[in-house]
Every structure is written in C-alpha cells, then in structure tokens.
UniProtKB/Swiss-Prot annotation:
Keywords assigned: Cell inner membrane, Cell membrane, GTP-binding, Magnesium, Membrane, Metal-binding, Nucleotide-binding, Transferase, Transmembrane, Transmembrane helix
Source organism phylogeny: Bacteria, Pseudomonadati, Pseudomonadota, Gammaproteobacteria, Enterobacterales
Highest taxon above the source species: Bacteria
Function statement: A probable diguanylate cyclase. The last member of a cascade of expressed proteins, its expression requires DgcM. DgcC production induces biosynthesis of cellulose in some E.coli isolates, but not in K12 strains. Cyclic-di-GMP is a second messenger which controls cell surface-associated traits in bacteria.
SUPFAM superfamilies in UniProt: Nucleotide cyclase
UniProt membrane topology term: Multi-pass membrane protein
Domain GGDEF as annotated: residue spans: 240-371
InterPro entries given in the database record: Diguanylate_Cyclase, GGDEF_dom, MASE2, Nucleotide_cyclase, Rev_trsase/Diguanyl_cyclase
Catalytic activity, as annotated: 2 GTP = 3',3'-c-di-GMP + 2 diphosphate
NCBIfam families for the chain: GGDEF, PRK10245.1
Pathway participation: Purine metabolism; 3',5'-cyclic di-GMP biosynthesis
Compartments where located: Cell inner membrane
Protein name according to UniProt: Probable diguanylate cyclase DgcC
One of the GO biological process terms: cell adhesion involved in single-species biofilm formation
Originating organism: Escherichia coli (strain K12)
Length: 371
C-alpha cells in the first residue's frame, strides 16, 4: 500500500468532488496551469524513457560497465518519470519545476549517450525524444538550452568514464531502437493533438462566455450592438430592409417584488424561449440587461416584424411559469424599420426605444411602430 501523496491537484479534485470551489486567485490559476503542463509531459516522458531501456541495455552488454550503472539505468527508465511528476505536482510553482525537470532530462540523456559511446542509432533515438520534448514544451529557447546541456553532459561523461566513442550499431541495437523511433513521434503527435483539441474547446467556451448572456444564452448587449452596427452598415451598403425590435416585460418590478427574484428570472428565461421558438433562426436576439431584450430582423419589413410579435403575444397568453402559474407575462414592443436617412446605428436604436416608450404610454401589452 503506497501512501497517498497530497498535492495541490488532489486538493482541487477533492474540492470539486464535495461541490466546493477553491479560491479563484491568479496564484491558484497559475498553479493549476503548471499542473496541467506537468501532466502532459508525464506520459511522453514515461513512454520515451521506458522505450530507451532495451536499446541502452543492449549497448551496455557489448562493453559491460560497473554493476551500479544497471541500477542507475533501471531508476532512470522506470522511476525517474514518476518521481519527476511527484516533484512537479508538489511544487509551489509546478511550471517552473517541470521546466527544471526537462533540463534534468537533457542532462541525463547526454550522460546515457556518453555511456553508450555515442552509439549512432540508440543515440539518435535518445536525441529525437529529448528534442521533441524540449521543443514541444518550451519552444526554441528551451530546445537550445537542453541541447547544450546534452552535449556538455555527454562530453563530461566520456571524459570521466574514459569510454571509447564508437558510432557503429550492432543489428540487435538497430532492432531494439527502431520501435521507439517509430512509436514515440506518434505518441507525441497524439498528445499534441489532444492538447490542441482541448485548447480549441477552451477557446470556444471563452468566446461563448464573452458574447452570450449567462442566464438566457442569447447575445449580451456588447456583442449584440456590434452585430447591430454590422447589420446597419450592410443594409445601407446593399440597400436592404431590416427591422429593429426592443422588448420589455410589463410590470417586471412588480413581479420581482411580489414573487421574488427567482420568479423574475423564470420570466426572463420564459420570454427568451418564446422568442426563440417564434422568431426565425436568422433573427438576432440580445439581452440588454434586466427585463429588456432586442431583436434584429434582417431583410424584414416592419409589417412582417409586427406579425411575428403578434405570435409572440399569443404564445405568452397561454404560457405559465412553472412555480407561479397565476402569473401571465405581458410585453411591450417597440418596432423601428431602418430608415435610409439614419446616419448612425444609434439613431436606429433610439427610434426603437421611442417606439417602446410609445407602447408603454399607450397602456402596455402592445406593439408600436416608430413614427
């Protein structure tokens, strides 16, 4: 039974399992990023070093070294990859620690190249593994630093041990080296693919978070206004129709005060769903904040927009909120068709806002068109 080694990754996993979130501080995020980096390096290191055990062992058999070299080889190939992970995962700064581990890999690799007498094929396999790891983890800067460490380590080993340089590889050494030469690049490519896929998904999520309203899933105001500006410019350029709607839930403050904010949130989500069900997929829905929504209906005259909103009104008449079926949602809508005389998209927005004010002043639960 091995003792459970407590580290920060265990802490984050334990907190998630109990429904707790660790404090979101820059330090914690840096630490978690470092742990993810160390975990990505762990598998390639373990496979690469284990795969080099037989090629190195075959060269040692041809000129037997002292017995302790075999212990060092076993420890390097099968213990060091897991020890390096534990060192990095328990470090205050896992990223810096793992970079140090990679440099240690380079030093040890250079040592083994020297011990093998620079035997050409096993040394080439070792060089390939180290170069891929260094370049993939730290780019050209870490690659050059690691390469220098390997060369220096190899030269020092040759000098201290007095081993004769022999570039020739026996057939056995060729056959034992070929599998790792073929397999390791495939493994490295697979790990890189997995990392790229996760990064792309992370980027997509960040993009959604930056453009969508968290409660309803429709566009937030900042992104929606960007789309409105683009639509305004395109319609003016191509002389195309478009209609802008601003929608407000009637007596929303009263709903909040009477039934609570949870019911208010239900009302906002219910209106969002009704708009999504009733309007076209090409209509751009955005939440302005609170209970106010806006819709861009591209290629649509005001009459068609009014007809669509009549269907929304009818749908809301039969809609009941799950926890408060006695509440009936009513909305006021301001409709503003694009006017060629408008010089800025904010004039269009103001026109729809004035139409909304007109609908509220006329008694609410209605749709009004800008004059």
């Amino acid at each position: 039974m091995f003792p459970k080694i407590m580290n920060d990754e265990n802490f984050f996993k334990k907190a998630a399992a109990h429904g707790e979130e660790p404090p979101l501080t820059p330090q914690n995020e840096h630490q978690r990023s470092g742990l993810r980096f160390a975990r990505r390096v762990r598998l390639p290191r373990a496979v690469g070093l284990a795969g080099m055990f037989l090629p190195i062992a075959s060269t040692l058999v041809s000129h037997p070294p002292p017995g302790w070299w075999w212990l060092v080889l076993v420890g390097w190939a099968f213990v060091w990859p897991h020890l390096a992970w534990q060192i990095a995962s328990r470090a205050v700064d896992p990223l810096s620690r793992e970079i140090y581990n990679l440099k240690t890999d380079a030093v040890l690799a250079g040592m083994w190249v020297g011990v093998m007498g620079v035997n050409v094929l096993p040394s080439t396999a070792m060089l390939m593994i180290m170069c891929l790891n260094l370049m993939g983890a730290g780019g050209p800067r870490l690659f050059v630093a690691g390469l220098v460490l390997m060369v220096v380590s190899c030269l020092v080993t040759l000098e201290l041990t007095g081993i004769t340089v022999s570039f020739n590889s026996a057939p056995l050494e060729w056959w034992l080296s070929l599998p790792i030469i073929v397999i390791y690049p495939l493994l490295f490519g697979w790990v890189s693919y997995q990392t790229a896929t996760k990064l792309a998904e992370h980027k997509r999520r960040l993009q959604v978070m930056s453009t969508r309203d968290g409660m309803t899933g429709v566009y937030n105001r900042r992104h929606w206004e960007t789309m409105l500006r683009n639509e305004f410019d395109n319609c003016r350029r191509h002389n195309r129709d478009a209609t802008l709607l601003i929608i407000d839930i009637d007596h929303f403050k009263s709903i909040n005060d009477t039934w609570g904010h949870d019911v208010g949130d239900e009302a906002i989500v219910a209106l969002t769903r009704q708009l999504q069900i009733t309007l076209r997929g090409s209509d751009v829905i955005g939440r302005f904040g609170g209970d106010e929504f806006a819709v861009i209906m591209s290629g649509t005259p005001a009459e068609s927009a009014i007809t669509a909103m009549l269907r929304v009104h009818e749908g809301l008449n039969t809609l009941r909120l799950p926890n408060t079926p006695q509440v009936t949602l009513r909305i006021s809508v301001g409709v503003a068709p694009l006017n060629p005389q408008m010089s800025h998209y904010r004039e269009w927005l103001k026109s729809a806002d004035l139409a909304l004010y007109k609908a509220k002043k006329a008694g609410r639960n209605r749709t009004e068109v800008a004059a």
